[in-house]
Amino acid sequence: MINSPRVCIQVQSVYIEAQSSPDDERYVFAYTVTIRNLGRAPVQLLGRYWLITNGHGRETEVQGEGVVGVQPHIAPGEEYQYTSGAVIETPLGTMQGHYEMIDEKGVAFTIDIPVFRLAVPTLIH
């Protein structure tokens, strides 16, 4: 979990076995992000950046506007949650990144997304 003076980010990931094909080096994961506005003013998420690293150290960068097609406004004391997915070539990897946000005065700020693991459950004891 990462905290800023205004925003808290939590991420949980899960392996999607039914959509994965290990023989084809295709491992599918879903991740759910919860963004909490701990401040006293509304914020808006404008963009995202992800660094996805597979088990061989191969990195893929993904960036774009909003999340899952929206640029959510998050009121003070409220949270926004969404689920998305990632496909990597190995049974173990990581994701990390940041969100680009603005406050009610239009001041831009960046919130780091903590590193989290993408892992097939049978690999982790």
From Swiss-Prot:
Record lineage: Bacteria, Pseudomonadati, Pseudomonadota, Gammaproteobacteria, Enterobacterales
Gene (UniProt): apaG
GO BP terms in the entry: error-free translesion synthesis
NCBIfam families linked to this entry: PRK05461.1
Pfam families assigned to the protein according to its UniProt record, in alphabetical order: DUF525 (PF04379)
Organism name: Citrobacter koseri (strain ATCC BAA-895 / CDC 4225-83 / SGSC4696)
Name of protein: Protein ApaG
Annotated ApaG domain residues: 1-125
Gene3D superfamilies assigned: ApaG domain (2.60.40.1470)
Record InterPro entries: ApaG_domain, ApaG_sf, Uncharacterised_ApaG
